[in-house]
């Protein structure tokens, strides 16, 4: 939940005054990543100048650069890292020439982006959501208890601001990194298909399925915890309504709700976009296969014609009679021109008439709930109706019952923003999700 206390002109003037700049060609970035990797293996988090030179030597060898000027180039690279505030240098008068180097927050942030944040972990996300859920519950309990301004700052505002908001930002960063990974997968698939699409089919399928699985796993984890998180945020928001001096808490809760909604919404939208891309790739592969078949046949036919005098051949072809479709798509199921007139005893009653009669009966029966002001549980009512009809009519009957029920009134629980529980309505797996109608 980033907030800037300075204005844009102040930030620009500050950056210009301090001469901030970052320039990291691929070899310098590789050197920084090597330093971060070696630094992570040390307990004290410190590196000497000799260790930095050794790391630079590895990078120089990987880029096939000359080793004659390794000392000068390593010294220039280290000084450049210090100037760009990627490394901090600490010198001592007792040990002159043996400086100690530590990565700055900027250096850690850049290397963390390229190294640690590249891996998606469901366990890590689950732990983050578990921590957020615990913090939100404690904050909601503290909000329900109430107290003075110090109580709200210490037990409600602080956990939301410095724990929940930062974890939400971390999850948002994970989503943005996965956006980049999707683009990288698309580039890899495009390169595979441009080289040899036959050999690339299995690799493309693997990349598509892995990315789809990762996106779905992330979204399922978010949706499973999203309702509980929103419920606790609503508890805090309800507790602040009676206090005019807690606008800072209310504004923070609103920002967190928007952030959570945006995270879950973009997760689903990202899945939908990836499904569209998946279909596009499969359509391209199918088209390529069809075109390649025609191309191979044309090439073989051309070679056969060119070598006819050396290897004569005969062409046999078959031209079967075309099968005509005798079905009239516009013909009604029981058109009088086809079936003739039926006796009155065999007249078929159209489904629309049956539906109107059934709707009238159900409307009359459901009106009892409104007259008595009794709560109407759609799950139980629909299940009772479906038990009276064959399975083939369950969908139509359930739709009629629900249409008539929602005309009678609304459920006050709908205004809380919490989803209703799924209730089974028949023995074949059908379920309905609806609050009890209690306001007519």
UniProtKB/Swiss-Prot annotation:
Compartment(s):
Cytoplasm, Nucleoid
| Listed GO MF terms | calcium ion binding
Kindly state a single biological-process term from the GO annotations of this entry: cell division
Q: Family per UniProt?
A: Belongs to the MukF family.
Q: What does this protein do?
A: Involved in chromosome condensation, segregation and cell cycle progression. May participate in facilitating chromosome segregation by condensation DNA from both sides of a centrally located replisome during cell division. Not required for mini-F plasmid partitioning. Probably acts via its interaction with MukB and MukE. Overexpression results in anucleate cells. It has a calcium binding activity.
Q: How does it assemble?
A: Interacts, and probably forms a ternary complex, with MukE and MukB via its C-terminal region. The complex formation is stimulated by calcium or magnesium. It is required for an interaction between MukE and MukB.
UniProtKB keywords: Calcium, Cell cycle, Cell division, Chromosome partition, Cytoplasm, DNA condensation
Q: Does the keyword Zinc apply?
A: no
Which region ranges are annotated with the description Leucine-zipper? 208-236
Q: Name one Pfam family in it.
A: MukF_C
This chain belongs to which protein, by name?
Answer: Chromosome partition protein MukF
Protein source organism? Citrobacter koseri (strain ATCC BAA-895 / CDC 4225-83 / SGSC4696)
Q: InterPro entries of this UniProt entry?
A: Chromosome_partition_MukF, MukF_C, MukF_C_sf, MukF_M, MukF_M_sp, MukF_WHTH, WH-like_DNA-bd_sf, WH_DNA-bd_sf
């Amino acid at each position: 939940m980033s907030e800037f206390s300075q204005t844009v002109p102040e930030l620009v003037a500050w950056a210009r005054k301090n001469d901030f700049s970052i320039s990291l060609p691929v070899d310098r970035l590789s050197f920084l990543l090597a330093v971060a990797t070696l630094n992570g293996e040390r307990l004290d988090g410190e590196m000497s100048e000799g260790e930095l030179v050794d790391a630079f030597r590895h990078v120089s060898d990987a880029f096939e650069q000359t080793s004659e000027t390794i000392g000068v180039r390593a010294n220039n690279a280290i000084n450049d890292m210090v100037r760009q505030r990627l490394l901090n240098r600490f010198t001592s008068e007792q040990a002159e020439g043996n400086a100690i180097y530590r990565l700055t927050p900027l250096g850690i942030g850049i290397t963390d982006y390229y190294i640690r944040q590249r891996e998606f972990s469901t366990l890590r996300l689950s732990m983050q959501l578990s921590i957020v859920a615990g913090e939100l519950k404690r904050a909601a309990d503290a909000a329900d208890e109430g107290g003075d301004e110090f109580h709200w700052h210490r037990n409600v505002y602080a956990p939301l601001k410095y724990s929940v908001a930062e974890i939400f930002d971390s999850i948002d960063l994970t989503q943005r990194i996965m956006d980049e990974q999707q683009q990288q997968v698309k580039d890899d698939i495009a390169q595979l298909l441009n080289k040899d699409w036959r050999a690339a089919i299995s690799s493309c399928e693997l990349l598509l399925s892995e990315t789809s699985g990762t996106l779905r796993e992330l979204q399922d984890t978010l949706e499973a915890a999203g309702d509980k998180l929103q419920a606790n945020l609503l508890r805090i928001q309800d507790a602040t309504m009676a206090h005019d001096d807690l606008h800072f808490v209310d504004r923070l809760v609103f920002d967190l709700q928007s952030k959570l909604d945006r995270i879950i919404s973009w997760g689903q939208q990202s899945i939908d976009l990836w499904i569209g891309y998946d279909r596009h790739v499969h359509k391209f592969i199918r088209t390529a296969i069809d075109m390649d078949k025609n191309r191979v046949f044309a090439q073989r036919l051309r070679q056969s014609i060119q070598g006819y005098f050396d290897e004569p051949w005969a062409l046999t072809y078959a031209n079967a009679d075309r099968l005509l479709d005798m079905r009239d798509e516009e013909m009604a199921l029981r058109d009088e021109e086809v079936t003739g007139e039926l006796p009155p005893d065999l007249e078929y009653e159209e489904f629309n008439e049956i539906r109107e009669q059934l709707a009238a009966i159900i409307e009359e029966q459901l009106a009892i709930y409104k007259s008595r002001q009794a709560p109407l549980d759609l799950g139980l009512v629909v299940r009772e109706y479906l038990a009276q009809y064959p399975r083939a009519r369950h969908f139509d009957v359930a739709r009629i019952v629900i249409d008539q029920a929602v005309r009678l009134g609304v459920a006050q629980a709908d205004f809380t923003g919490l989803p209703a529980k799924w209730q089974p309505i028949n023995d074949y797996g059908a379920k309905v999700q609806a609050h009890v109608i209690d306001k007519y």
